């Protein structure tokens, strides 16, 4: 790869930018067609003024490589590398001093063989059997003798004291695993274990609350552009635009009257260009330009928001047994036992197990140099390097093509008269030039010879009418001379003094729009606007590009204790301990703490282009046209006195350029001209001398990654640090799956204005400006960020091991491993290589709270949080007015028993009822006083229900009782008669946010009550649906800043504004202050959530919540009583043949002639002895016909059980079963028996064979249309049809011919066999609102419907309890019948079928309704 030095890179970069700019410039200039080439002029040696620089030439070919620059100064040391891999073992250390002598051993022998066998290479050193003979004097070492017979085993000597530790060698490479030890003896029986493992999981609990939304995911690729949305409504009228650029010239005015002929003047030389006129008024805005070409496809879009979590799947099959876990760490060694007394000599034993390890041998020789360690983490930025030497100047580029005509320079002073030129060839007539300022009249030239007649020039535009001159004296008539030859041009007259400026002309017609000017310098920062009203949260926008990397934070406090290292090599097994009691299985630990923040990710893709810049201000007027052709020579006139200033004539057409005049002498410097267009980028100048230090620069962009520094040396092992405060928040994880949407939160208070955002990303590169003057040298800038990764450096010297991290928290207890075999104790190995980071352990105990950190800058808005828990209950308010009568309450707990009543007469024995499901466990009542014991009477008949007593006074709220065990759900009781209105109940806990009501008139603020005791937290209610937006209330006092609201949707792009005028080009200003923030960059990835705000004051106590949803199913009840013995089953299959019986008595003689036709076989058994059933004689078949018929009948019955046909005799369990067995059957009425008992209770349903739904018909199916309810009360409330209205009834379902309650039992089973239910009802209305109130624009008067588990479904609110209107024809009072069709669909099958309906908009004499109840369908 070619490596370029800095100067060459700069030149290439400059050429690249210039080429790009040139291409852009060429696109921007749309020139007219090229004219024909003019004839060559005959101008001799006239040097024109120096032209403006030409446009940049094409990039030259790459010049030859420059000489190598001087070696730069040494860079700052690189960042510390990561710890290197463990090195090879070091050289052996010196041997330790000898241990003290052991006690005398038993009789000697030749131990050489045992010594030689005592080396165990795997243990890493020489392990000597500790078998000492009697201690003799040390002789010289003899050669090894032949192996002797093994001597008897000596007693184990006392262990020698450990030698001094040798110098620690470097860590050796990991050895291969040793062979498995022999299985150990069985250990002693363990103590009885603790309680067994946790039992099987209970039944599935109720659905949990939605989880908190996951952290925002990493930004995905940019999506393709969506289809165009529908056209939005017209926006509000925009602010008045800036004035437009000048319009095109108007058409010439009518021709004036012809002026008197003047004397024919001699054409003066072209005057110098006039001074720049004042800017004209801007013209109107030009029409919008043509639509640009379609852009290329965008990047892939960010992944969409995660869908709602699906329903919990069924539990999967149990997995196979996992692989055996890794062996645990070795236990700590036990204390050494005391030495025993010597015993008598034993018989020679078998060879003993290997003795205790000897002292570790000296370290080995140094190993070969290890491979380079892995790349270290990027270190901190090094200090800025010193400036390099200037590079060699590049070669001169090729001459560029001729530049465009520059603007006219200032008018020069008049030059001295030139020498007379030779006569030129006759030029083609030029177009008329613009009128130059009048020159002073030149001195009369000598009369020339008469010239030939020239060709007639084109007719000039009519001149303005001159003022009347003074009448001259009449001359004598001369003879007409013949036209002479044209004379030589006279000497050039002196340039006249410029005339005074004329009066300001009238404003001309608007010119054509100018080209866009360059953007002006940024204006001063405007005053901060008032905070706007908070908008509604929009849908989530696409994830923005990642924000700019923040500055490096301060070093964090010490981190938490590190995770456990990877298990070391399996140590030698200790001797088996007694078996401990089995521990109870621990609960799953809490999830571990978040990990540390990861390293910064790679730079993101480039951001999208910035918004189109603001319209520039109008450009300057163009330079004047070139001088026109020379006119015919006139007769010299006398110099007239200057006339008065004429009126300004209409603008003439532009002339074609004249030929160049002779070069004038240099005039004095004119005033500086207007700013010219930017010149091309010059070649880099030579390097200036170092300037003095400037002010501190802004933070630099991230540099390229520098080369990896040499790894630092390993530090010594540090002490275990204290547990640090929690680390910073981890980097955002990948986007989790989106949880189900949380309930809507209430609108937060308006947030305080945020701090000024960071400067946005730089816009696209502008055109290169002209080189500025050398600035003052800047001060040394901040250290830059780390550059991109350089080439890998040479491996550094091996560093010492780093300090081990603090011990991590204990991991989750693993399952008990299989019992390992007892291995021989190994010698201590060298420390193994550092393991990989283990998985996070379970949470340690919480550390002490760290000191509060400084408040961070406001982070970007976090993802929308869940609705918070209800606040502390506020103080009880003042007694409110009595509320509307409550709905019938749940039965209260049993009161204390009363004294026994007198015995009633014996009643008749009732029918045996169905065994009810166990009810919920009631609270225990107080025991009543014992009554006098009466004689047992007969069981009385049930008495009639008594009237409901008057409501009791409201009791004080009780303290929270212990939670009872959840009972099984009881079957619904029969509805009681409607109770009288009770007194207002105690205010309940705060419920969920209801639907947004219509705005009331603001009431006067009440005084806050004192704070009451904190109530028991109610069940979490369902979030209400968002109501329609009320009109704005009066502005409240400013609240404490609420949490940041959710990010709104990215609005649709507005219509493009009109193009502004082109401005004047300014001078290059001094370095400005940092500009105001640029247009927002794309949204960065969401930052971590900001710190929580201060806790708000307790909110007011909310209204009481709705009843909570049913509790989770209770534990499985005790087994029921033993059932009755079953009926006798069908006969079993025939048994195996019995053993042969004893021989029978001899039979009578047989007539063999019957079998004469069989013939006699020569070989084989007698054919009569082995008759098969299918070969039996026809006489045997008489009896088999019944058997065959029975078998066939049984076969048909079994087949019909396996594949029911939906008849009354053979019903299916559900329509889904019928569809599976007979997919080709059509939808229609079939019989099903969900409880699978006797088929006599089967019921007839409609089976939708396309979906498999079982639809049960209502009975009856209609509520007649009439006026069901009259009320003079003006207060509207929902009235239940079955419970309250006279003649109303609860809807029932199933076949009317079935025994009472049979349909309910069958429906209970059908609900259990189904996962989804749906039902439609049609509400026929006359002057009654069913769903949407068109006049009010809300759903306040919508019906309520009651499900079979007494849950009410509404038109709005929590989506799980809302129904939908498929058709709504009851939105206003028309005096005619209309209808609204309502559908409720739910996966909670217990809520269906619908059993009652409550309209609100009824009670008037002209308000009637009726209902068609549709079948309830289960799938």
Swiss-Prot record:
GO molecular function: extracellular matrix structural constituent conferring tensile strength; identical protein binding; metal ion binding; MHC class II protein binding; platelet-derived growth factor binding; protein homodimerization activity; proteoglycan binding
Composition-biased stretches (Gly residues): 292-301
UniProt keywords, alphabetically: Calcium, Collagen, Disulfide bond, Extracellular matrix, Glycoprotein, Hydroxylation, Metal-binding, Repeat, Secreted, Signal
A GO biological-process term: cartilage development involved in endochondral bone morphogenesis
Skewed-composition ranges (Pro residues): 89-104, 140-149, 365-374, 1001-1011, 1131-1148
InterPro entries from the UniProt entry: Collagen, Collagen_superfamily, Fib_collagen_C
Positions where 5-hydroxylysine occurs in the chain: 122, 219, 231, 240, 306, 540, 552
Propeptide: 26-113
4-hydroxyproline, modified sites: 591, 600, 603, 606, 840, 846, 852, 1113, 1119, 1134, 1137, 1140, 1143, 1146
Positions of modified residues (3-hydroxyproline): 602, 839, 1076, 1118, 1133, 1139, 1145
Post-translational modification summary for this protein: Contains mostly 4-hydroxyproline. Prolines at the third position of the tripeptide repeating unit (G-X-P) are 4-hydroxylated in some or all of the chains.
Disulfide bonds: 1215-1247, 1255-1417, 1325-1370
Region: Triple-helical region, residue numbers: 133-1146
Domain Fibrillar collagen NC1: 1185-1419
Domain notes: The C-terminal propeptide, also known as COLFI domain, have crucial roles in tissue growth and repair by controlling both the intracellular assembly of procollagen molecules and the extracellular assembly of collagen fibrils. It binds a calcium ion which is essential for its function.
Function according to Swiss-Prot or TrEMBL: Type II collagen is specific for cartilaginous tissues. It is essential for the normal embryonic development of the skeleton, for linear growth and for the ability of cartilage to resist compressive forces.
Self-association and partners: Homotrimers of alpha 1(II) chains.
Protein name: Collagen alpha-1(II) chain
């Amino acid at each position: 790869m070619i490596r370029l030095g800095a100067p060459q890179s700069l030149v290439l970069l400059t050429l690249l930018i210039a080429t790009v700019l040139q291409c852009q410039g060429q696109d921007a200039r749309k020139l007219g067609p090229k004219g024909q080439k003019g004839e060559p002029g005959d101008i001799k040696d006239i040097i024109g003024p120096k032209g403006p620089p030409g446009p940049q030439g094409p990039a030259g070919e790459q010049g030859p490589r420059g000489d190598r620059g001087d070696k730069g100064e040494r860079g700052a040391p690189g960042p510390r590398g990561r710890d290197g891999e463990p090195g090879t073992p070091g050289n052996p250390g010196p041997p330790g001093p000898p241990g003290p002598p052991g006690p005398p051993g038993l009789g000697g022998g030749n131990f050489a063989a045992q010594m030689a066998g005592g080396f165990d290479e795997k243990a890493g050193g020489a392990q000597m059997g500790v078998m000492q003979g009697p201690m003799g004097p040390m002789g010289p070492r003899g050669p090894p003798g032949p192996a002797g017979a093994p001597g008897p085993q000596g007693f184990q000597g006392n262990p020698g004291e450990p030698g001094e530790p040798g110098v620690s060698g470097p860590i050796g490479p990991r050895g291969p695993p040793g062979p498995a030890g022999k299985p150990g003896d069985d250990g002693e029986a363990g103590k009885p274990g603790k309680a067994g493992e946790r039992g099987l999981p209970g039944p599935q609990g109720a659905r949990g609350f939605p989880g908190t939304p996951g952290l925002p995911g990493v930004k995905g690729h940019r999506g393709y552009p969506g289809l165009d949305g529908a056209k939005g409504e017209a926006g509000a009228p925009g602010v008045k635009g800036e004035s437009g650029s000048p319009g095109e010239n108007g058409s010439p005015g009518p021709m004036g009257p012809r002026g008197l002929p003047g004397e024919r003047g001699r054409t003066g030389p072209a005057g110098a260009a006039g001074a720049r006129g004042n800017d004209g008024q801007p013209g109107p805005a030009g029409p919008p330009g043509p639509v640009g070409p379609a852009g290329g496809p965008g990047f892939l879009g960010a992944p969409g928001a995660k869908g709602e979590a699906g329903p919990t799947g069924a539990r999967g099959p149990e997995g196979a047994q996992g692989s055996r876990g890794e062996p645990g760490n070795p236990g700590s060694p036990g204390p050494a036992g005391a030495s025993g007394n010597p015993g008598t000599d034993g018989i020679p034993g078998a060879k003993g197990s290997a003795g205790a390890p000897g002292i570790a041998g000296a370290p080995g020789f140094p190993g070969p140099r290890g491979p380079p360690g892995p790349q270290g983490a990027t270190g901190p930025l090094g200090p800025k390097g010193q400036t390099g030497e200037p590079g060699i100047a590049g070669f001169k580029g090729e001459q560029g093509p001729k530049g465009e005509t520059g603007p006219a320079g200032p008018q020069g002073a008049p030059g001295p008269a030139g020498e007379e030129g030779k006569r030129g060839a006759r030029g083609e007539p030029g177009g008329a030039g613009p009128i130059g300022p009048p020159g002073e009249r030149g001195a009369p030239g000598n009369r020339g010879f008469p010239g030939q007649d020239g060709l007639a020039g084109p007719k000039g535009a009519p001149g303005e009418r001159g003022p009347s001159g003074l009448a001259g004296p009449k001359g004598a008539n001369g003879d007409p001379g013949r036209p002479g030859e044209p004379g030589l041009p006279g000497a050039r007259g002196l340039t006249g003094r410029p005339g005074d400026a004329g009066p300001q002309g009238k404003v001309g017609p608007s010119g054509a729009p100018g080209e866009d000017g360059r953007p002006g310098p940024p204006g001063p920062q405007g005053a901060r606007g008032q905070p706007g009203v908070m908008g509604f949260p929009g849908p989530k926008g696409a994830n923005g590009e990642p924000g700019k990397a923040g500055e490096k934070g301060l070093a964090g406090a010490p981190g938490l204790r590190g995770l456990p290292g990877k298990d070391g090599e399996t140590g030698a097994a200790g001797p088996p301990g007694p078996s401990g009691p089995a521990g109870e299985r621990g609960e799953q630990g809490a999830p571990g703490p978040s990990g540390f923040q990861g390293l910064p990710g790679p730079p993101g893709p480039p951001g999208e282009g910035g918004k189109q810049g603001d319209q520039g201000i109008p450009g300057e007027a163009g330079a004047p046209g070139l001088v026109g052709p020379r006119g015919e020579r006139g007769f010299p006139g006398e110099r007239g006195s200057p006339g008065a200033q004429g009126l300004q004539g209409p603008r003439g057409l532009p002339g074609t350029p004249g030929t160049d005049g002779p070069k004038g002498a240099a005039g004095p410097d004119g005033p500086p001209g207007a700013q010219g267009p930017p010149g091309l980028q010059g070649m880099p100048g030579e390097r200036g001398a170092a300037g003095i230090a400037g002010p501190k620069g802004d933070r630099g962009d991230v540099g390229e990654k520098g080369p990896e520094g040499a790894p630092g040396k390993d530090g010594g092992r540090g002490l275990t640090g204290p547990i640090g405060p929690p680390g910073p928040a981890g980097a955002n994880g990948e986007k989790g799956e989106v949880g189900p949407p949380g309930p809507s939160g209430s609108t937060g208070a308006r947030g305080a204005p945020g701090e000024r955002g960071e400067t946005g990303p730089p816009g696209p590169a502008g055109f290169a400006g002209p080189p500025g003057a050398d600035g003052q040298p800047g001060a040394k800038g901040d250290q830059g960020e780390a550059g991109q990764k350089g080439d890998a450096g040479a491996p550094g010297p091996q560093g010492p091991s780093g300090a081990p991290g603090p011990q991590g928290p204990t991991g989750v207890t693993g399952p008990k491993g299989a019992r390992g075999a007892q291995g021989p104790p190994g010698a201590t190995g060298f420390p193994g290589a550092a393991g990989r980071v283990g998985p996070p352990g379970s949470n340690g105990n919480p550390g002490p709270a760290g000191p509060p950190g400084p408040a961070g800058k406001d982070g970007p808005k976090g993802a929308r949080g869940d609705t918070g828990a209800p606040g502390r209950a506020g103080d009880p308010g003042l007694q409110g007015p009595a509320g509307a009568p409550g709905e019938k309450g749940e039965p209260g707990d049993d009161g204390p028993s009363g004294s026994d009543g007198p015995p009633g007469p014996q009643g008749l024995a009732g029918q045996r009822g169905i065994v009810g499901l166990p009810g919920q466990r009631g609270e225990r009542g107080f025991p009543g006083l014992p009554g006098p014991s009466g004689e047992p009477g007969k069981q009385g008949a049930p008495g009639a229900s008594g009237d409901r007593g008057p409501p009791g006074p409201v009791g004080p709220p009780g303290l929270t009782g212990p939670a009872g065990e959840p009972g099984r759900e009881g079957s619904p009781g029969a509805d009681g008669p409607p109770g009288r209105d009770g007194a207002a109940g105690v205010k309940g806990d705060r419920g969920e946010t209801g639907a947004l009501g219509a705005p009331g008139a603001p009431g006067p603020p009440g005084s806050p009550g004192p704070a009451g005791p904190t109530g028991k937290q109610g069940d979490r209610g369902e979030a209400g649906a968002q109501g329609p937006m009320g009109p704005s209330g009066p502005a409240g006092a400013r609240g404490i800043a609420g949490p940041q609201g959710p990010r709104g949707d990215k609005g649709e792009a507005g219509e493009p504004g009109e193009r502004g005028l082109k401005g004047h080009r300014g001078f290059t200003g001094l370095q400005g202050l940092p500009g105001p923030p640029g247009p927002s960059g794309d949204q960065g990835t969401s930052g971590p959530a900001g710190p929580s705000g201060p806790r708000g004051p307790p909110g007011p106590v909310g209204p009481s919540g709705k009843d909570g949803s049913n509790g989770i199913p209770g534990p499985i009840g005790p087994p029921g009583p033993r059932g009755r013995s079953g009926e006798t089953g069908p006969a079993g299959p025939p048994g195996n043949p019995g053993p042969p019986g004893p021989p029978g008595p001899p039979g009578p003689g047989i007539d063999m002639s019957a079998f004469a036709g069989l013939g006699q076989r020569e070989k084989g058994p007698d054919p009569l002895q082995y008759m098969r059933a299918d070969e039996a004689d026809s006489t045997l078949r008489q009896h088999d016909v019944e058997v065959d018929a029975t078998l066939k009948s049984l076969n048909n019955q079994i087949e019909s059980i396996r594949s029911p046909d939906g008849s009354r005799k053979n019903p299916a369990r559900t329509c889904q079963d019928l569809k599976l067995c007979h997919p080709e059957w059509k939808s229609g009425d079939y019989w099903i028996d969900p409880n699978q008992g006797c088929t006599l209770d089967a019921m007839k349903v409609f089976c939708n064979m396309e979906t498999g739904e079982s639809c049960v018909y209502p009975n009856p199916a209609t509520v007649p249309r009439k006026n069901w309810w009259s009320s003079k009360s003006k207060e509207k409330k929902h009235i239940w049809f079955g419970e309250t209205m006279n003649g109303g009834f609860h809807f029932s379902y199933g076949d009317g011919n079935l025994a009472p309650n049979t349909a309910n039992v069958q429906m209970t089973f059908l609900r259990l066999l189904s996962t989804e239910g749906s039902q439609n009802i049609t509400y026929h209305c006359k002057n009654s609102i069913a769903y949407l109130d068109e006049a009010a624009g809300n759903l306040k008067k919508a019906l309520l419907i009651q499900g079979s588990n007494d849950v009410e479904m509404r038109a709005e609110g929590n989506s799980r309890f809302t129904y939908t209107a498929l058709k709504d024809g009851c939105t206003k009072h028309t005096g005619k019948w209309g209808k609204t069709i309502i559908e409720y669909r739910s996966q909670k099958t217990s809520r269906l079928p619908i059993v009652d309906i409550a309209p609100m908009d009824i009670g008037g004499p002209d308000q009637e309704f009726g209902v068609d109840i549709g079948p309830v369908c289960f799938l």
